[in-house]
Amino acid sequence: MTRVKRGYIARRRRTKIRLFASTFRGAHSRLTRTSTQQKMRALVSTHRDRGRQKRDFRRLWITRINAVTHENRVSYSYSRLIHDLYKKQLLLNRKILAQIAISNRNCLYTICNESIK
């Protein structure tokens, strides 16, 4: 069998994995096999959580808007506000509405009143 001269390919691959796993704790940052497995798990988690992050922020925005609208009037709810905004064709997304709710509640109250009229 002929000899294959690969140079430092394997060492370069392991070094890349070690650099990725350098912030992991314990054997996950030192041993090649466990660091490879942890790298795969970390990449799976980041891929999954990128989608989950979008859902979590949307839930947070909805909660903030709903809290401010309930302070304004007891009978007014988040779902009715969004429905009225769509009817009036006021195109404000939930992120912007949540920022307005935090920074300037009076502005959100005027938006609510405009959507009712």
UniProtKB/Swiss-Prot annotation:
Predominant cellular place of this UniProt entry's protein: plastid
Q: Does the keyword Transcription regulation apply?
A: no
Supply the InterPro entries for this chain. Ribosomal_bL20, RIBOSOMAL_L20_CS, Ribosomal_protein_bL20_C
Keyword tags: Chloroplast, Plastid, Ribonucleoprotein, Ribosomal protein, RNA-binding, rRNA-binding
GO process terms (BP): ribosomal large subunit assembly; translation
**Which positions, given as ranges, span the membrane?**
none
Which Pfam families does its entry note? Ribosomal_L20 (PF00453)
Q: Name one GO molecular function term.
A: structural constituent of ribosome
Instruction: Name one cellular component (GO) term.
Output: ribosome
* SUPFAM superfamilies, alphabetized: Ribosomal protein L20
Subcellular locations according to the entry? Plastid, Chloroplast
Give the disulfide map: none
Going by the entry's taxonomy, the superkingdom of the source organism is recorded as Eukaryota
Q: Which family does it belong to?
A: Belongs to the bacterial ribosomal protein bL20 family.
> What does it do?
Binds directly to 23S ribosomal RNA and is necessary for the in vitro assembly process of the 50S ribosomal subunit. It is not involved in the protein synthesizing functions of that subunit.
HAMAP family (UniProt xref): Ribosomal_bL20
Q: What is this protein called?
A: Large ribosomal subunit protein bL20c
Organism the protein comes from: Ceratophyllum demersum
Query: What gene codes for this chain?
Result: rpl20
